[in-house]
């Protein structure tokens, strides 16, 4: 009997411990298929999910990643009403047809219209009566020079010769109508002139510009939202579902626990028709328990994040590559996808995470420095940075994430035990620029492995490397004179 034989049950490997072995390939990087699954019923065009962190994903980030083909998870460090509002902003950002357009009553004022336009970031609003019959439309042009904020909308709206269409008109015909009449908004009405939707020229052009966008069956951008395990979880979920959330992520530090499993079962009883992803976990046993309880997806990663201190504070975790592989083995044949969450520094790590069995990766630090992240902008030593913090940091826990680390009953900040830190990351430009490089690296890796799609990438093989192999993998014996957009030296 020995300690190693009795207590060490597995080797723990992470991304720097291995490299993928190149294989015979008939696949060009530009031809690989990147579509995958986020959850049981939600497909992505690219395997990238932005993290439910208060310095990573709010509406602006969720819109940007969905337009690229991924999905964002809006964090829960805000009121129920505000989180639902963030979801609604994403769902209204882009539509084939807006089925529940923002409207205004004919007796409302100019001030009311301007407030709605500012809240929803829109430039025009259909005007309806109490029965939702269309009586006019008011746009920025109607209000631009109006000084009387108390004037009734029906005094300034366009009410004559309103161009409309019916629900059966196809998008090509809609484009012709908009161009022919030089209008940007086209109300959709039924045979009785009752408003049933709205089509905008902006949405049509967006659809053409971003054909890979991740959208639902109504042409709206997809978005997920995070919840914790608290007394108001179901109330929060109801508000998020009503706002249009496509999936809910039950986000905790330890998903393989009684309280989380019971909350999952309760949530599935109340919301059987919406996908619920649960995390975080690090073992196949945990994955089986969550799937048995009804999970539509699982999130893998305990402690690998750049701002996470769980492994050193609690002494707990599984190196990320091994965790992903162990969960992937357990999920084989279930149809339930896994999200590899954390530990990613380069695009090559993304390829490794997917090759180990991931269907998508959750990214935090890689995108926290982008224009679309909600983190504060910081100037330090003449360089631009953005704030980035773990949801287990003291600052985030004070703002609402205590329940993620099972400390919701602690009111004294001095008695909180953080499992994360607050930091800063270099400003990186737009999300599009970052995703472009990550996707490019993923395509290259799949080409080297001869993998035409992510399912085939799961068959790729690894070689274990030494510390010398890691050093050899990075630029060495030179001074970098021109930085690449997809590489910086590890700190």
PLM ranges: what are they?
Residues 30, 79-88, 146-150, 194-214, ...:
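Active-site-adjacent beta->alpha loops and helix N-cap segments on the catalytic face
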Residues 30-44, 51-53, 82-120, 127-129, ...:
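Bateman/CBS regulatory modules and CBS-like beta-alpha motifs in cytosolic regions of diverse proteins
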Residues 43-50, 96-101, 216-226, 267-282, ...:
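Short beta-strand/loop segments at the ligand-binding rim of alpha/beta enzyme cores
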Residues 60-63, 235-243, 282-300, 340, ...:
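Catalytic cores of alpha/beta
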Residues 1-24, 104-105, 166, 226, ...:
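Alpha/beta catalytic cores of nucleotide-metabolism and tRNA/nucleoside-modifying enzymes
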Residues 74-79, 122, 126, 133-149, ...:
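Short beta->alpha transition motifs characteristic of CBS
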Residues 67-82, 245-257, 296-314, 344-378:
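Glycine-rich phosphate-binding active-site loops on the catalytic face of alpha/beta enzymes
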Residues 73-77, 103-104, 124-126, 164-165, ...:
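Catalytic beta/alpha-barrel core
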């Amino acid at each position: 009997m020995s300690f190693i034989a009795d207590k060490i049950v597995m080797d723990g490997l992470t991304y720097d411990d291995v490299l993928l072995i190149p294989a015979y390939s008939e696949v060009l990087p530009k031809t690989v298929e990147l579509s995958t699954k986020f959850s049981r019923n939600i497909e992505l065009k690219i395997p990238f999910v932005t993290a439910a962190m208060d310095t990573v994903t709010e509406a602006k980030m969720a819109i940007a990643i969905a337009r690229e083909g991924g999905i964002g998870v809006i964090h829960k460090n805000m009121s129920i009403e505000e989180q639902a509002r963030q979801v609604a902003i994403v769902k209204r950002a882009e539509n084939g047809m807006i089925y529940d357009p923002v409207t205004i009553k004919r007796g409302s004022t100019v001030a009311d219209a301007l407030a709605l336009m500012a809240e929803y970031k829109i430039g025009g609003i259909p005007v309806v009566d109490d029965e939702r019959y269309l009586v006019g439309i008011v746009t920025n042009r109607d209000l631009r020079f109006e000084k009387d904020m108390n004037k009734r909308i029906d005094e300034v709206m366009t009410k004559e010769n309103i161009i409309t269409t019916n629900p059966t008109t196809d998008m090509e015909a809609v484009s012709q109508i908009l161009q022919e009449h030089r209008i940007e908004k086209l109300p959709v009405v039924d045979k009785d002139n009752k408003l049933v939707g709205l089509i905008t020229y902006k949405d049509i052009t967006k659809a053409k510009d971003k054909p890979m966008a991740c959208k639902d069956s109504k042409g709206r951008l997809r978005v997920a939202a995070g919840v914790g395990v608290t007394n108001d979880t179901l109330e929060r979920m109801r508000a998020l579902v009503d706002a249009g959330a496509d999936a809910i992520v039950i986000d905790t530090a330890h998903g393989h626990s009684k309280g989380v499993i019971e909350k999952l079962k309760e949530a599935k009883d109340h919301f059987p028709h919406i996908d619920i992803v649960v995390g975080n976990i690090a073992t196949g046993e945990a994955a089986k328990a969550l799937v048995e309880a009804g999970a539509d997806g699982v999130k893998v990663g305990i402690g690998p994040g750049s701002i996470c201190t769980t492994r050193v504070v609690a002494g707990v975790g599984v190196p990320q590559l091994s965790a992903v592989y162990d969960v992937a083995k357990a999920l084989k044949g279930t149809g339930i996808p896994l999200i590899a969450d954390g530990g990613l520094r380069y695009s090559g790590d993304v390829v490794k995470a997917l090759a180990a069995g991931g269907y998508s990766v959750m990214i935090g630090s890689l995108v926290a420095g982008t224009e679309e992240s909600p983190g504060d902008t910081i100037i330090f030593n003449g360089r631009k940075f953005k704030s980035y913090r773990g949801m287990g940091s003291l600052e985030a826990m004070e703002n609402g994430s205590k329940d993620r680390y099972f400390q919701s009953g602690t009111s004294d900040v001095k008695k909180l035990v953080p499992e994360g830190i607050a930091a800063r990351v270099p400003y990186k430009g737009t999300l599009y620029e970052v995703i472009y490089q990550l996707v490019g690296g993923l395509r290259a890796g799949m080409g080297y492995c001869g993998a035409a799609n992510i399912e085939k990438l799961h068959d790729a093989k690894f070689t274990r490397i030494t510390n010398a192999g890691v050093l050899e993998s990075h630029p060495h014996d030179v001074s970098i004179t021109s930085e690449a957009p997809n590489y910086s030296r590890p700190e």
